[in-house]
Structures are given as C-alpha cells and as structure tokens.
C-alpha cells in the first residue's frame, strides 16, 4: 500500500488487475473467510512473478494479525498447492522475510512437508510497509502424485 495514493484507489486497481489476469489464467487469488460471520481473515494467491528459472508460479499469502497462529496459512497453502498441482507437475516459489518468525516457520514447515528446497538464486528484495528487506526463496514441486 502506497500511503501517498488513496487506499480505495489502490484496492480497486488490485481487484481489476486480479480479475483480468485471473480470467486469463495468469493469476489466481482466493480470500480466507470465517464461515460463521463472513469476516475477511486473509488472502492467498499465485502469480507468474518469479525469480528462478525453475518456478512457473509464485505463491503469496497474507493473514490478518487477529487470525494468525491458528493454522490458517498452513491449511490455505496446502489447499492451493494441491489445487494447482491437481493436473500437472508444477514448481512454485515461496518467498519469506527471514526476520518474520511466524512466516518463516510456516514456509519452512511447508517446504519440509512438500519435500521442497531453498533456492538462494531466487532471493530478492521486497518492500513491505515502506521497508525493503531481502526475502528468502524456497521451491516446492507439486503435482498429481505429490500431495
């Protein structure tokens, strides 16, 4: 989010881009909703913004702070990886800020469960809340027989 641009304008732009690229199969996003009150808990999605030669997709997610530490990210990641790999074998990048303890734990657990690996060549700087940090890259192979 850019603090110098209207929040609503940025959200509208994101939704338009997500819808357009989603319809063409270039991006897939889902919301995480609490079923009993329809509260928005997070987002998860794939796009083609990758840093490695091997990966076809990049997986990103966000879980609101009040919904963290309940396994929601892990369950959502596993579900989307299974969905993406239901037909073909696919390599997916996951990036994580190594200083984000909870995110790092989630990604490392996912990489371990899916027999993934660290990919230093895919490390890249990411700006979050105005702070630029080097995010570590991990690769996971998913496919019909992987999940």
Predicted regions and their residues:
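Short linear sequence motifs
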Residues: 7, 23, 130-131
